Regions:
Chain B
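Hydrophobic residues at beta-strand termini and immediately following loops
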Residues: 5, 119, 230-233
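G-domain G4 guanine-recognition motif of GTPases
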Residues: 71-72, 96, 156, 177-178, ...
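Nucleotide-state-sensitive switch-loop elements of NTP-binding domains
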Residues: 33-66, 74, 83-170, 181-183, ...
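Residue-level signature of catalytic and energy-coupling elements of molecular machines
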Residues: 5, 67, 99, 154, ...
Length: 115, 260
């Protein structure tokens, strides 16, 4: 459940952003959660719901989550597979098992709507 | 700059994450006074900045840092005890122990006569760069802690969460013990894609468990073809020489300025 500590970091950033923008209410938070960043989307959302319910600034805020795609290159035939889903078991073209992933390994606060 | 000693870490109270607030896209929607701010800041940025500072700090004092990640009970502490015995008088070792509760692991390591401190996370399932920073300062105040060639950071026993947090280590080592089964690389890929070295431990138990080493190693290499792989038993000493050779090379490379 390291998602909880990441949500705590997020809440800290949101408080700072709200203060910088003289906002008293966060309405909507958009996150990008890469499929390979080691964060479980449901756990992150669960943590966000718990923590946001305890903070006046965040109570009722909506959490939007974007899942970016990962680009896997087959080390056998060079075929590229682009997916936001689970890591492919093997190359669909040549059945090679080693696929080289690029992207999708970050957890990014994209946008905040506040008032 | 760190308040404790002036090491490269940002001080605990500093605003160390560099989120780039682009306010140029902010606008007001027609029906309310709400305002949208594009932030585009990684939540890992704060930890990564501290990890980078930790790495610079380790470099300044000439220490190679290893982050040991595994499930609970894979034999991390026993391996450290055997490693300390084998390298005593040759390489100056320091240990940061991470656990949720108790000083037990630190007591075991202290009994071996090397500087050690225990970090108890009080529930957190992983170490992060900030904890490591504080831990290393405490370690440096321990007898012998001012001169360390090889720093072991034994993470909280957990094959999931620690994989996400860079501590500033030079090498990350993931351990899987034979009783755990060979499917760990397939089930917990992040620990293997983010590591430099994969160690199969408790190989003395291979006759009693169904653990095809080539299958486990093959799965791990498919995830991370650069992974160095070793198998050993801390109990019988089988395979220990390969592990010790790896550690000696790391320390030698560090001294020669080849490891950044």
């Amino acid at each position: 459940m390291h998602e909880i500590s990441l949500v705590q970091n997020l809440v800290q950033q949101l408080k700072e952003l709200a203060a910088e923008n003289q906002a008293t209410k966060i309405l909507r938070v958009t996150m990008e959660i890469g499929p390979l960043c080691g964060v479980v989307v449901d756990s992150f959302r669960f943590g966000f719901d718990i923590i946001s319910s305890e903070e006046e600034l965040l109570r009722g805020a909506e959490l939007l989550i974007d899942i970016p795609t990962v680009r896997y290159t087959c080390t056998g035939c060079g075929k590229v597979i682009v997916t936001a889903g689970p890591r492919p078991d093997c190359c669909p073209a040549c059945q090679e098992l080693t696929l080289f992933p690029e992207g999708g390994d970050d957890l990014i606060l994209l946008q905040v709507e506040m008032e | 700059m760190c308040d404790t000693c002036g090491c490269p870490s940002p001080s605990d109270h500093s605003h160390d994450h560099d989120h780039d607030h682009r306010h140029d896209h902010s606008h007001k929607s027609g029906h309310s006074h709400s305002k949208t701010v594009d932030v585009h800041a990684s939540l890992f940025a704060a930890n990564d900045a501290l990890a980078k500072a930790n790495r610079e700090h380790f470099n300044e004092v000439g220490a190679v840092a290893l982050n040991l990640i595994s499930s609970p009970g894979s034999g991390k502490t026993t391996l450290l005890e055997q490693t300390i015995d084998a390298l005593k008088g040759e390489i100056r070792i320091g240990v940061i122990e991470g656990d949720i509760e108790t000083e037990r692991d630190a007591l075991r390591i202290r009994a071996k006569g090397v500087p050690v401190i225990q970090l108890t996370t009080g529930g957190a399932c992983h170490l992060d760069a900030a904890m490591t920073h504080k831990g290393f300062h405490r370690l440096q105040k321990e007898p012998g802690g001012e001169n360390i060639d090889l720093l072991f950071i034994e993470n909280v026993g957990n094959l999931v969460c620690p994989a996400t947090f860079d501590l500033g280590e030079h090498e990350r080592v993931v351990l899987v013990s034979v009783p755990e089964g060979p499917d760990k690389p397939a089930k917990y890929p992040k620990a293997f894609t983010s590591s430099h070295t994969f160690l199969v431990t408790k190989t003395d138990l291979l006759p009693y468990f169904d653990f095809p080493v080539p299958e486990a190693v093959g799965d791990a290499l498919r995830l991370n073809p650069q992974l160095r792989t070793m198998s050993l038993s801390s109990k019988t000493g089988d395979g220990m020489e390969t592990w010790l050779k790896y550690l000696r090379e790391l320390v030698a490379n560090k001294k020669a300025g080849k490891l950044k």
